């Protein structure tokens, strides 16, 4: 365990600026995070660069605008951590007498040495990789060589990377043209893109953990989401005791996504096997591949309102109404709208004089 894991180191650097005056304010920050995972080597890494911008400004006494936005770019490299056959599983069950390395081929377990000799002679079933580094080959247990293999070999059998970009935020506008009235328009949004790539070549760890095939997969996902809301509030007091509050508005939500993925595997699938060719674009014409695409779109629309009347802060009545419609591609046209009215009444007994005088 001590050889397979490293102390986790994390770096975080931030720069922030802020300012303002009697008409507005702003805040901006830039942040970088680099995190090495617990697995030794460079196969377990997380990087993120992000920025935040918040600002609001009163253009006129009756108009305020603002924006809150964040942007981030991230990338990861990871190893299998859960389940039977993962590198962590091998780390936990491998006997403690097995060294990390075989420094010479003569130290190899017999079954692995036999496959190694076949590769050297050109008679193996595939051009197997035998994992190791400048210190030697990663060792398997000699006591049961067909059981769990070296966790270091399982760590290195696959090259997997992920990355993406996300921008999200809210823009808003508040109008107050006369006393008691406020109109708000607000747009929330999220734009995202992510991609993944994985590659493995024929390898031999032991009789159970091996593959004669090259395998490659890649995927990309793009999406955008937005919610546009408009609503007005009006509050007025008449003759000091009659309070009326009204609100009406609408909300529209749209969500779009597009996912593309592809994979291929076989004994000889690529035009070449140098690092620059380890992508689906360089598949041979007769290579068996699988490509899928699953775009999606949904939308919803809502109208809502509320009316409240109260007398002397003691008696009140409230009426609410909301109508929601969902995308006709998800619901039939006759069932796409839902209507939700409600009415309530209230009595604030603590504001009654006869209770105040006796409690």
Residue ranges and their predicted role:
Residues 1, 38-44, 52-166, 184-301, ...:
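Surface-exposed loop/interface segments of Gram-negative outer-membrane beta-barrel transport/assembly proteins
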Residues 15-21, 53-57, 169-175, 230-234, ...:
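Residues on the lipid-exposed face of transmembrane beta-strands in outer-membrane beta-barrel proteins
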Residues 32-36, 317-329, 349:
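Transmembrane beta-strand segments that form the barrel wall of outer-membrane beta-barrel proteins
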Residues 173-191, 197-198, 300-327:
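Glycine/serine-rich loop-strand microenvironments at binding/catalytic pocket rims
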Residues 339:
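Phosphate/anion-contacting hairpin/loop surfaces
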Residues 4-5, 12-40, 50-58, 66, ...:
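Predominantly transmembrane beta-strands of Gram-negative outer membrane beta-barrel pores used
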Residues 10, 21-22, 58-60, 176-178, ...:
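Outer-membrane beta-barrel channels and translocator barrels
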């Amino acid at each position: 365990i001590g050889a397979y894991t490293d102390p986790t180191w994390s770096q975080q650097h931030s720069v922030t600026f802020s300012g303002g005056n009697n008409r507005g304010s702003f805040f901006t920050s830039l942040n970088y995070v680099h995190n090495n995972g617990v697995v030794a080597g460079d196969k377990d890494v997380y990087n993120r660069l992000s920025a935040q911008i918040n600002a609001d400004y009163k253009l006129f006494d009756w108009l305020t605008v603002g924006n809150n936005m964040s942007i981030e770019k991230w990338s990861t490299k990871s190893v299998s951590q859960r389940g039977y056959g993962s590198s962590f599983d091998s780390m936990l069950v491998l006997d403690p007498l097995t060294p990390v390395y075989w420094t010479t081929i003569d130290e190899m377990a017999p079954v692995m040495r036999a496959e190694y000799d076949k590769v050297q002679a050109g008679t193996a079933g595939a051009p197997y990789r035998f994992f190791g580094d400048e210190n030697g080959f990663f060792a398997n247990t000699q006591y049961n060589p067909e059981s769990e293999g070296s966790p270091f070999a399982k760590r290195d059998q696959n090259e997997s990377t992920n990355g993406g970009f996300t921008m999200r935020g809210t823009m808003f506008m508040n109008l107050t043209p006369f006393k008691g009235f406020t109109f708000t328009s607000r747009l929330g949004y999220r734009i995202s893109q992510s991609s993944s790539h994985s590659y493995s070549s024929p390898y031999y760890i032991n009789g159970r953990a091996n593959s004669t095939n090259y395998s490659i997969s890649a995927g990309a996902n793009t999406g955008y989401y937005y919610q546009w809301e408009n609503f007005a509030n009006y509050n007025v007091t008449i003759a000091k005791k009659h309070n009326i509050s009204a609100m009406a508005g609408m909300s529209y939500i749209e969500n779009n996504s597009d996912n593309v993925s592809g994979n291929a595997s076989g004994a000889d699938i690529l035009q070449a096997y140098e690092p620059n060719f380890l992508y689906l674009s360089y598949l041979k014409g007769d290579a068996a591949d699988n490509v899928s695409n699953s775009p999606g779109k949904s939308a919803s629309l809502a109208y809502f309102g509320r009316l409240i009347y109260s007398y002397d802060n003691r008696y009140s009545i409230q009426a609410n109404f909301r109508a929601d419609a969902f995308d006709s591609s998800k619901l039939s046209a006759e069932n796409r709208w839902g209507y939700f009215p409600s009415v309530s009444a209230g009595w604030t007994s603590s504001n009654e004089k006869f209770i105040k005088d006796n409690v």
